Amino acid sequence: MWIPRPFSAALLALAWLAAPAGAASLMVLSPASAAPGVRALAALYTAKTGIAVTLAGGGRDKIFAALKAGGPADVVVLPTNDLVDTPSVAGMTPLGRIAVGVGVKAGAKVPDVSTPQKFRSALVAAKGVAYADPAAGTSAGKLIDQLLSAPEFKGVRRVPVQGLAMTALASGQADIALQMLPELAANKEVALAGPVPENYVAGVDFSTGIAASTTDALQAQAFIDFLTDRQNAAVWKANGLTPFGN
């Protein structure tokens, strides 16, 4: 666990003076891709400590807007690249990596994407491969666009979309969607083919930090320590995030 010393020390000291004793709740902002793991661990944390944890967030831009507005927040979970550029968050503790998944419309034939060759063949054969428009600035969108720009994926019919890639499956714009795996797995209208093969390192690193607007940085840090406890690695894995070192 790592927090920049000058900033975090000052923040923790202020929080110690400002926070009400026995704070009974925490607000956590998280994008949908990391939410299943955060939600599962939040329930365990509440059972262990009695501290209620509320999960909010949604899309990247919505989280940024909430932080900029100084709304209620104690802990923030974001792709590491986004968290680095977010002044409203103090410190950065790495969590792990979430893989990009391959999904098709529920009821459609699910392609075999278990090897690099089979993955490439499935994408080339598709009438359209949807993914988040990289112009929107999301880490997943930029990563997937870079992957599909490689010479070996020449001929893939790319369908960059605004918002969630899986919406293009329902509209018929594409028959394959590349999106963060937990998001695909959580949608009943999508059949998950699996993750992009590891050879392509198609995953987004996530980290967490303390929101500058928190009124209890000590409790926020305690929750972050719980999130990164090695004993909770299995919970993360079951919800689509592979902790670093596992």
Predicted regions and their residues:
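Exported/periplasmic ABC-transporter solute-binding proteins
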Residues: 24-61, 65-71, 80-98, 104-246
